[in-house]
């Protein structure tokens, strides 16, 4: 018996150790005394109750187990089982905002009726083999092509009903057009996960996320969120906050406002991400004071802590690693981005890079893909990189947290350093204590 090579162990200030397994998602807290006893049991090959409990969560494995080979099997099974389809659809590539850090070029307009027809055929053809269909609406600003969203959504719901599919539909919108009528229309076609971005409080947000003619947007978004709060329907509404060194100090003021609006309504939540430099056509990104790679996780955890302290729900915050939890959708063989002209991409960022354009949807609703390009996105295996193969986080990303980073900049796409995960585990542990929850010696799978 031995400790799993995919364990991450983090020491807390009160002396507890947090053990987390990146393959099984098992997490437990043990005292320093228990941790020493576990090591002694393993040295003596003693099957104690605590060792048997750790075995259940994969934190302890038998000596002969090849964990990398087992991971390879599980990763391949999860990626290639083929019973799901993930489409990220751009109903238009135009936008009513001009954000300082935007990487899009707005060269294409709204999706034509012909392209809509092809997408409907695509889903109908795939449906008999599917258990699950996931559709994300992206842009540009997708609500500028509201009719396209409604038309395709009605068709997808019919297909769902005919074939008994699990169906999930979500939208990423700047929120400017998301008034009461629009919210109700989206909910009527089962678009129940909505993400809107607000980058700090009023002044900083309006400097980063303004209308095409330069107008302000913060107050309209705040009003639309208040209007959504008044609805009785079921949905999940997430406010994404992108941060840099200049707007981060204003985020607490935004959180105070959101606390006042949400009023402990658990349909609403927040999450935080650093602003990244993905290029852009106007060079505005170069005027922003971006946080360094080393500061991103500490800042994110601090903001999450501030949100939790106000009673806000944190969606997509730090979570303990698990199998493929950091894997990018672009690395999945059954995930496609569909442009407004029917072009197929793997990534929603690098639309103007040829390696990202992998094919198109043909007139019969078939996916016509360039296999060579597809292989570049989905064919890379984590055990092929000697550095990744040695990493305890390998199960969570399988060296594909960002395939674009490996393809475009030839860099290793690490989602987080192990030290950052340890910091995150300490944050989770402290959050439990701060909420009055007892951390027990237990393994949760």
Give the predicted meaning of each segment:
Residues 69-184, 189-192:
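Conserved alpha-helical substructure of the radical SAM core
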Residues 63-83, 312-322, 357-387:
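Short, charged low-complexity linear segments at domain edges
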Residues 22, 338-339:
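Short, acidic, Ser/Thr-enriched surface-loop or helix-capping motifs
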Residues 140-142, 174-176, 199, 242-244, ...:
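Active-site beta-loop-alpha junctions enriched in small/polar residues
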Residues 3-29, 48-88, 128:
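N-terminal [4Fe-4S]-dependent radical SAM core
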Residues 105-109, 207-215, 408:
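Short glycine-enriched, charge-decorated loop/helix-capping segments at active-site entrances
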Residues 203-222, 226-331, 337, 357:
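Radical SAM enzyme [4Fe-4S]-AdoMet core and its adjacent flexible, acidic
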Residues 3-6, 351-445:
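Flexible mid-to-C-terminal extensions adjoining Fe-S/redox cofactors in radical SAM and related proteins
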